[in-house]
Curated annotation (Swiss-Prot):
Keyword Ligase: no
Pfam family, one: CBM_48
CDD domains: AmyAc_Glg_BE (cd11322), E_set_GBE_prok_N (cd02855)
Superkingdom per UniProt: Bacteria
Function description: Catalyzes the formation of the alpha-1,6-glucosidic linkages in glycogen by scission of a 1,4-alpha-linked oligosaccharide from growing alpha-1,4-glucan chains and the subsequent attachment of the oligosaccharide to the alpha-1,6 position.
EC number, UniProt record: 2.4.1.18
Matching Gene3D superfamilies: Glycosidases (3.20.20.80), Golgi alpha-mannosidase II (2.60.40.1180), Immunoglobulins (2.60.40.10)
GO molecular function annotations of the record: 1,4-alpha-glucan branching enzyme activity; cation binding; hydrolase activity, hydrolyzing O-glycosyl compounds
Gene from which the chain derives: glgB
Protein name (Swiss-Prot/TrEMBL): 1,4-alpha-glucan branching enzyme GlgB
Recorded catalytic activity of this chain's protein: Transfers a segment of a (1->4)-alpha-D-glucan chain to a primary hydroxy group in a similar glucan chain
Keyword vocabulary terms for this entry: Carbohydrate metabolism, Glycogen biosynthesis, Glycogen metabolism, Glycosyltransferase, Transferase
UniProt source species: Escherichia coli O6:K15:H31 (strain 536 / UPEC)
Length: 728
């Protein structure tokens, strides 16, 4: 019988260098009849078994002591179901032969994957528990077109790459194999001989769960059930909705006090979710929770884009957290990182021995600042991997929005590069046309497939139309972070009040471009690290003035057009920079009422008042929703404006950014009547000096600032006040 199989083929198969195992293993028609061949290292005896009766049909002959068996089934001409009875170390085991099953991926799926238009590639690629021909197991599929051989290794086969080599689908470059008996919870990887002949162990790019660092294996895990979007969650993302985002790093929001260990997803559901709800926030934004090897990356260098990190629990635990947030009325935003990935050898880098996911030229494919690799967006399968991932988090976990990280680094080829360190596009320009098309396509698909979910761009340049529709030349994001506003206003606030009059335009300039994008006003994690100090510590003056400045700034921010974002700890004025390895300084809220409690109460009241009054959020992106009343009083550092809703109801916002109270400050108004003070950052409730206007003030028919009626107010020191007109 040995003449039927070439000895070189057997040697290559056993050595793990044979690329087409299905041409040899399994059941085949030969001139001698139906022949079954199996590679079973360490086996001593093998029989072909009839599943229904358990009858032994034939004993396979050992053609190679390293585990290659073959035998002809007598009196059989047509293929049939069979099992193998295998003796290992004196123990007989009944197994199903992986090599008796046909191709796994349907032709249409293979076509769409190759074309890069498969909306949900994760439903085909990766590891999926399945039943084939009555046999339960797991089907594995991985894209590695340049690999010479790929095997599945894991807890089900002693991590032995000889035991389960995969079938290559040449039309798509995908390797596939159904392994009977492999089940949810088992660890696995792909072992491959790469394009250069090197042996590699790779995690599954499409793994739904992964081991916690420093381990790097993937886990077989069922695809999560779809989460249905609700109308309430859709409405909470709309342009006219109040959006106040609490940005959180799950690993350092709060830790166990006895061992400084993280809270689990379920503990966070029980503690973080009710806290954010009580504080009045509408959205939770999570720094990336994709699996990542390095804690210090904060999640922004992911290796498991489809797997929630195991640091805080399982995939189901994360689903529990999301469900708890939704039950509390909070939408969830996930920081999403399609811009780059780390160089770790177990992940995407040189996946099949070639630059499969990244560009080959480091001038296109390497981030010097972060020591990471840049996705090749022009490769259809790569962009499909990323677009599918966006849909995956929204559809399978109920994520309500994706905040896309570092967009500027994606859309500019010369981002953080000197001359000669980057390659122009085909037209000689600096724009990364493939990345731009990828972002437009992603936003288009999300708009079509999961209407109601939105995307937000962290984009640090003046690239036009980031949050404008694709048919208008835009990128199609729903919102864009206003980093210019953030830098200008923080630069202003850190000044001694005596010098602020010379930088008045830092607070007014934002309105000159306010309606070019749909802006979010971010005080994010990036502003409290790397020596920048905390937001509180940037404020000038003694302790009283620092807190007063911060309260005035928050009052200004919550009133200014744009959605709001505040990083954790800033809501109670944490004094030190953020440390990802430690809990927030919750002890600042212990030991009785203090300034930190005052800021915390203010942020809560800002959220609740902002949400209650439509004028503060309904027309953020419509010029009718805002009007300056006093814009040029730079000598006294006073700014006053109106926020307006669709029905014309107004709220007056007045800020005094000096420590000098301004008594009898008169300015013109649009609507005469009684104006009630609904928020005062100088209130004693927030540990201010309690200067103000006695709760309400009536307008006078005295012309001022070109208007027939006016108000005369007391503007408290270093404070912002909000007033609403009461009905007659």
């Amino acid at each position: 019988m040995s003449d039927r199989i070439d000895r070189d083929v057997i040697n290559a198969l056993i050595a793990g260098h044979f690329a087409d195992p299905f041409s040899v293993l399994g059941m085949h028609k030969t001139t001698a009849g139906l022949e079954v061949r199996a590679l079973l290292p360490d086996a001593t005896d093998v029989w072909v078994i009839e599943p229904k009766t358990g009858r032994k049909l034939a004993k396979l002959e050992c053609l190679d002591s390293r585990g290659f068996f073959s035998g002809v089934i007598p009196r059989r001409k047509n293929f049939f179901r069979y099992q193998l009875a295998v003796v290992w170390h004196g123990q007989q085991n009944l197994i199903d032969d992986p090599y008796r099953f046909g191709p796994l991926i349907q032709e249409m799926d293979a076509w769409l994957l190759s074309e890069g238009t498969h909306l949900r590639p994760y439903e085909t690629l990766g590891a999926h528990a399945d039943t084939m021909d009555g046999v339960t197991g797991t089907r594995f599929s991985v894209w590695a077109p340049n690999a010479r051989r790929v095997s599945v290794v894991g807890q089900f086969n002693y991590w032995d790459g000889r035991r389960h080599p995969m079938r290559l689908r040449k039309e798509s470059g995908i390797w596939e194999l159904f392994i009977p008996g492999a089940h949810n919870g088992q660890l696995y990887k792909y072992e491959m001989i790469d394009a250069n002949g090197n042996l590699r162990l790779k995690s599954d790019p499409y793994a739904f769960e992964a081991q916690m660092r420093p381990e790097t294996a993937s886990l077989i895990c069922g695809l999560p059930e779809k989460v249905v979007q609700t109308e309430e969650r859709k409405k909470a993302n709309q342009f006219d909705a109040p959006i106040s985002i609490y940005e959180v790093h799950l690993g350092s929001w709060r830790r166990h006090t006895d061992n400084n260990f993280w809270l689990s997803y379920r503990e966070l559901a029980d503690q973080l979710v009710p806290y954010a709800k009580w504080m009045g926030f509408t959205h939770l934004e999570l720094l990336p929770i994709n699996e990542h090897p390095f804690d210090g990356s904060w999640g922004y260098q992911p290796t498991g884009l489809y797997a929630p990190t195991r640091r805080f629990g399982t995939r189901d635990d994360f689903r529990y957290f999301i469900d708890a947030a939704h039950a509390a009325g909070l939408n969830v935003i996930l920081d999403w990182v399609p811009g780059h990935f780390p160089t770790d050898d177990f992940a995407l880098a040189e996946f099949d021995g070639t630059n499969l996911y990244e560009h080959s030229d480091p001038r296109e494919g390497y981030h010097q600042d972060w020591n990471t690799l840049i996705y090749n967006y022009g490769r259809r399968e790569v962009s499909n991997f990323l677009v599918g991932n966006a849909l995956y988090w929204i559809e399978r976990f109920g994520i309500d929005a994706l905040r896309v990280d570092a967009v500027a680094s994606m859309i500019y080829r010369d981002y953080s590069r000197k001359e000669g360190e980057w390659i122009p596009n085909e037209f000689g320009g600096r724009e990364n046309l493939e990345a731009i098309e990828f972002l437009r396509n992603t936003n288009r698909i999300l708009g079509e497939q999961v209407s109601g979910a939105v995307t937000m761009a962290e984009e640090s340049t003046d690239f036009p139309g980031v949050s404008r529709p694709q048919d208008m030349g835009g990128l199609g994001f729903w919102y864009k972070w206003n980093l210019g506003w953030m830098h200008d206003t923080l630069d202003y606030m850190k000044l001694d009040p005596i010098y602020r009059q010379y930088h008045h335009d830092k607070l007014t300039f934002g309105m000159l471009y306010n309606y070019t994008e749909n802006f979010v006003l971010p005080l994010s994690h990036d502003e409290v690290v790397h020596g920048k100090k905390s937001i509180l510590d940037r404020m000038p003056g003694d302790a009283w003035q620092k807190f007063a400045n911060l309260r005035a700034y928050y009052g200004w921010m919550w009133a200014f057009p744009g959605k709001k974002l505040l990083f954790m700890g800033n809501e109670f004025a944490q004094g030190r920079e953020w440390n990802h390895d430690a809990s927030l300084d919750w002890h600042l809220l212990e030991g009785g009422d203090n300034w930190h409690h005052g800021v915390q109460r203010l942020v809560r009241d800002l959220n609740l008042t902002y949400r209650h009054h439509k004028a503060m959020h309904e027309l953020d992106f419509d010029p009718y929703g805002f009007e300056w009343l006093v814009v040029d009083d730079k000598e006294r550092s006073v700014l006053i404006f109106v926020r307006r809703d669709k029905e014309g109801n107004e709220i007056i916002v007045a800020s005094n950014f000096t420590p000098v109270p301004r008594h009898d400050y008169r300015f013109g108004i649009n609507q005469p009547g009684k104006w009630r003070e609904i928020l005062n950052t100088d209130s004693m409730h927030y540990h201010g000096s309690n200067a103000g206007n006695g709760g309400a003030v009536h307008s006078d028919e005295i012309a001022s600032h070109g208007r027939q009626h006016s108000l005369s107010l007391t503007l408290p020191p270093l404070a912002t006040i909000w007033l609403v007109r009461e009905a007659e």
